Amino acid sequence: MLAVARIAAEGLARPVLIGEAGVIARAAEAAGVDARAFEIVASESTDPRAAAQRAVELARAGDVDALMKGSLHTDELMSAVIHKSHGLRAATRISHAFVFDLPRYPKLLALADCVVNIAPHLPAKRDILTNAIALLRTLGVVRPKVGIVAAVETVNPAIQATLDADSLVALAQTGEWGDAIVEGPLGFDNAVSAEAARIKGMRSQVAGDADLLLMPDLNAGNMLYKSFVYIGGGECAGLVLGARVPIVLTSRADSMTSRIASVALAMIASAGQPAS
């Protein structure tokens, strides 16, 4: 609720609170926030799934430009989002991307997918890249540099991530993502350090200058994302992509900066997102 108040005060978005009115009022009072300052759309019951469905209805109708998870569980919101007939599915697979500001990296760095797709196969990785590259372009990255991350830099038939990386690079060469530089497989060290790539004798346009890292699976992505935050001192904004509207999935441990940055990113993505 404090994040909602900050978002409104800073003019980033016009918050619409969705749920049972009494629950919203009590949450606002506990946070010291005047709920009357916001538009409230009441759901029919205290069941969080009713609030999720109402939010999806508003998004389908074009009455809201983005969704942000409040006090309900992620699966309660996402079940409504991915509903086959009444959800927010669009042309591509739904995925997630973080955009990081890291103290020791020279520019913003995106990671995908660290939240939604557990063990993506090749077609899923293609869609994850499609969504994340589109997000980068809304941020002004005209020619994204993408590293497909694996444990090793060479294609190894025993490591599926390296085979997928090789296939994605070949797909990029057909123009699948337009003017984007896609390289892989890259070890994480090579992807973020030109010096590491030089020592290993690699020639790369991406090493040390990546805009986006495609992680091999959710385990690797989620651990790297949390390492960036809790050890690396990074701040991040994250979005669910590939739905009709961008979706902010907050965690209880997220910083206020991360929450506000995610909403700002959602507004940018929404403005640059083609109509469904």
Give short role names for the model-derived ranges.
Residues 1-206, 211-276:
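Anion-binding alpha/beta catalytic cores of soluble intermediary-metabolism enzymes, centered on
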